[in-house]
């Protein structure tokens, strides 16, 4: 069964699709059979970044039932070990698919024959985007080192945790009503952590609350800091970890630091992945370590660090150590 890697961004402009694309190429270069799936249905553009024409069947074709065999959506990219499923933005309204269509797409994605399926999601926090993000316990969220990105990522994770928790209880149940009431109280200026909300549910419905708490503990979002400028980003980046721990009662983890890379603009203009066009660029140097960290998580190795600041600081230091070593080798 393929490992699913849903990649979300709390807001547009954080470079989510660039990260998804180059991570997919990196995994393919490591001989991992990889499928890149464009699930940004309102603004699909990965075909452009790959240098492919948008003239083949995609998810829009499937949603509108013009193609009924999901496997026919797979197309070659010209890159060994990498296949692609287009979002197909020719059909208006496909981003607002019904629940059963979404469920069918998720089931088909889970059945794909590959080592990894990277799911590039749309920006924002609609239920469709969140449900694709929650196809795994440890989805990836891409942030940039600015306050609006950090706060939007927190808002996205808050919506995802609420959606995840809500789905643990039966429809029209009193437990769901307590969760809904917590949203109303938040609108009135009273905000509670998920620990506090679940404690209220546990006091009345201990059995169902225990199951929900057990599932909540499995949530482990992974974060990639993109367009970083250096060590000054660490303090800002750790705000997101502290917010998720204190307010959402979940443990998130940084798995990558991707520096700002001026070559990205040129790679977009040339319609060629940067990992192909200029594999020694700053962004591309960061990708193998991200792939290794993700693979270590999948293989069951415990790479989580309890000290949240050490987590991001270690990743930033590791990147610049690698960069300095590369620079030294050029002059040896």
Question: Each PLM stretch: what is its role?
Answer:
Residues 122-253:
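Conserved catalytic-core segment of NTP-binding enzymes
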Residues 37-115, 171-173, 178, 182-192, ...:
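P-loop/Walker-type NTP enzyme "switch/lid" segment
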Residues 41-43, 89-92, 124-125, 146-149, ...:
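Conserved nucleotide-binding/hydrolysis micro-motifs of P-loop NTPases
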Residues 248, 254, 259-270:
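Nucleotide-binding motor/catalytic cores of P-loop/tubulin-like NTPases across gene-expression machines
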Residues 179-180, 304-332:
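A short, charged, Gly/Pro-tolerant segment at domain boundaries
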Residues 269-286:
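C-terminal boundary of histidine-terminating zinc-finger modules
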Residues 110-128:
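Glycine-rich phosphate-binding loop used to anchor ATP phosphates in small-molecule kinases
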